[in-house]
């Protein structure tokens, strides 16, 4: 008789683990999407600056005479 009760408990534990895994994966996907959006915004800002005045943008990164 005890074996009859073990199987449903094992299935329930497996289902809970699957649910936890699915929740973790969904959270990771959301975080990944958020990071991609932030990166896209940064790249858009750089592209906009280069379209406006590329020379000034590049010169802001160039050292001048011993700086």
UniProtKB/Swiss-Prot annotation:
It comes from the Bacteria. GO terms for biological process: modification-dependent protein catabolic process; proteasomal protein catabolic process; protein pupylation. Keywords: Isopeptide bond, Ubl conjugation pathway. The N-terminal unstructured half of Pup provides a signal required to initiate unfolding and degradation by the proteasome but is not needed for pupylation, while the C-terminal helical half of Pup interacts with ARC to target proteins to the proteasome. There is a cross-link at residue 67 (Isoglutamyl lysine isopeptide (Glu-Lys) (interchain with K-? in acceptor proteins)). Strongly interacts with the proteasome-associated ATPase ARC through a hydrophobic interface; the interacting region of Pup lies in its C-terminal half. There is one Pup binding site per ARC hexamer ring. Belongs to the prokaryotic ubiquitin-like protein family. It comes from Bifidobacterium longum (strain NCC 2705). This is Prokaryotic ubiquitin-like protein Pup.
């Amino acid at each position: 008789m005890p074996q009859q009760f073990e199987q449903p408990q094992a299935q329930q534990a497996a289902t809970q683990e699957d649910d936890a895994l699915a929740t973790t994966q969904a959270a990771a996907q959301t975080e990944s999407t958020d990071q991609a959006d932030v990166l896209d915004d940064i790249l858009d800002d750089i592209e906009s600056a280069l379209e406006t005045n590329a020379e000034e943008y590049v010169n802001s990164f160039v050292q001048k005479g011993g700086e």
